[in-house]
């Protein structure tokens, strides 16, 4: 595995920290767009990159939040035009946890 690929993945320790920090889907906790999914989609919890891996988003705590499969798909697919709104909420959430949180600092640099 090359250095960049490794830097963009959440390792087991980081995944655990994110899961422990968020206690489930950050969007379900605020009741965000809860009407269009099955119970199965709400129960499957993923770690979501805030800055996408395809954009060089690092696999670090400050670049990950938990989301159920439904909300993860909403954010990744952007089919309903909610990505910008979802990222704004995540920005506020992360800023409350990490002083000076800045998504521009979450990108891989050589």
What are these regions (language model features)?
Residues 9-46, 68-70:
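Short cysteine-rich loop/turn motifs with clustered Cys
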Residues 47-52:
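Short basic/aromatic active-site micro-motif
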Residues 3-4, 15, 21, 53:
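Basic side chains
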Residues 2, 6, 36-39, 54-65, ...:
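Polybasic, low-complexity binding patches
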């Amino acid at each position: 595995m090359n250095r960049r690929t490794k830097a963009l993945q959440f390792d087991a320790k980081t995944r655990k920290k994110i899961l422990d920090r968020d206690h489930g889907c950050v969007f379900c906790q605020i009741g965000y767009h809860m009407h269009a999914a099955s119970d199965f989609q709400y129960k499957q919890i993923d770690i979501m990159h805030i800055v996408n891996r395809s954009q060089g988003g690092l696999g670090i705590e400050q670049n990950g939040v938990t989301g159920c499969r439904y909300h993860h798909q909403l954010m990744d697919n952007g089919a309903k035009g909610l990505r910008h709104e979802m990222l704004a909420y995540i920005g506020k959430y992360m800023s409350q946890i990490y002083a000076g949180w800045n998504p521009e600092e979450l990108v891989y640099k050589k």
